[in-house]
Amino acid sequence: MNLYPINAGNFKLDGGAMFGVVPKSLWQKTNPSDSNNLIDLTARCMLIESGSRLILVDAGMGDKQSEKFFSYYKPWGDDSLIRSINNAGFSIDEITDVFLTHLHFDHCGGATVLNSNNISVPLFKNAKYWSNKNHWDWATSPNSREKASFLNENLIPIEESGQLCFLDVKSPGFNHYDELGFDVLFVDGHTEKQMIPKVSYSGKEVVFMADLLPTAGHIPLPYIMGYDVRPLTTLEEKRRFLNLAVKEGYCLFMEHDAHNQIITLKETEKGIRFGGSLSLKDL
């Protein structure tokens, strides 16, 4: 097995929204903001090469939307999904599976693209697209709070193409899925049934954190995004996960942290905190 970091692009979001009730005087120590209160973020996906399978975990926000749409998210840098896949030595037609942790636009937008007729179609024509029915139903009949994050042009083409597949939601904790060859944890704080994958690699357990832990600055328990639909649920999910991660020595692959690809954790007098920064090449 091989794992590759795939940078699908970089963007900025309001630091206050990213840290909820935590004062700026605290969160800016780890995530400094610009003059508009925006902090640097990235869309770091992961590519899993396992036998004949090439599984992409998340796909960034893509480039289908209007200039006005992107003006809110201030893209920066030259990274892109297709370029990063090519730089890893693969083509988009070789992708066999796309595992979408959840269907907010910054995680799934790159999975579809506009064709020559300006119609949104799946980018990965030979791939199965994985979600779960609970979350799919949640996203396609969205609540008012999340409606702006669930975009039909990102979702409907996947369903209409016949490439959409659902994982069964299993009991709490990590459960193994033979369909994909790795374990998945379902969490409900950020959105309904977000899927967190865990991959055994080089003798380590690598967990793709998605929005359960957006950046290393979110490790302290109360540091929860204002975007989360159930913040108290996130608090308990983080508590359970972080305790398990320290106990088992997990390596946390950070999707949105612009500065840390992988982090480790350690116990301190103040609770679980940042232990160190690594990359997949270090494992």
Question: Where do the protein language model's features map onto the residues?
Answer:
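Active-site beta-strand termini and strand-to-loop segments that position acidic
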Residues: 48-51, 198-202
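Cap/insert and terminal regions of metallo-dependent hydrolase folds
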Residues: 72-83, 200-283
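Zn-dependent metallo-beta-lactamase
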Residues: 1-56, 61-65, 69-72, 170-173, ...
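Active-site metal-binding loops of divalent metal-dependent hydrolases
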Residues: 8-9, 59-62, 103, 134-135, ...
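Residue-level marker for buried hydrophobic side chains located in beta-strands
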Residues: 55-57, 99, 129, 206-208
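Metallo-beta-lactamase
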Residues: 76-79, 84-90, 94-106, 121-186, ...
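Metal-dependent catalytic neighborhoods of phosphoester/phosphodiester hydrolases
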Residues: 108-119, 264-265
